[in-house]
Amino acid sequence: DEKKLNDEETLNNKDQNIKLSPDDEFQRAFDMLRNQNFEEAKFAFQQFIKNNKDNSLSGSAHYWMGEIFLLQKSYREAALVLAEGYSKFPKSVKAPDLLYKLADALIKIDKKMDSCNTLSKFIEEFSNNRLIEKVKKKIIDQDCQVAIE
């Protein structure tokens, strides 16, 4: 067993020393998430963001990290990661999703006004997005004082 463990450690160390392309690094983190290895995925997404500050996938990495925090009921951490993702990558393909999930995280930490403002921002920025009806429903459910035409 000790020999096997050492072989696994060597394999893991070799993997860490291989420089992956940003796409491969993101895919590796996403595969960990898909396999429900949440802690490893969270760490891998953090590393991806650190290593690829300007990569177009960094917004998506923030989104998936936020999702992991939401799954783990770490709502404050989710809100921080999702807000950072949106503020740094407002043009990301995941920007609407970042705002949508940010509103969820904010309501969970009793930040109703911030959640409502986030939903309002969603409507301003992404009025034709596939999530718009869900956003409007959330605004009504949370009794936000926001125009939803």
What does each model-found stretch correspond to?
Residues 51-57, 88-94, 123-135:
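Short solvent-exposed coil/turn linkers within tandem alpha-helical repeat scaffolds
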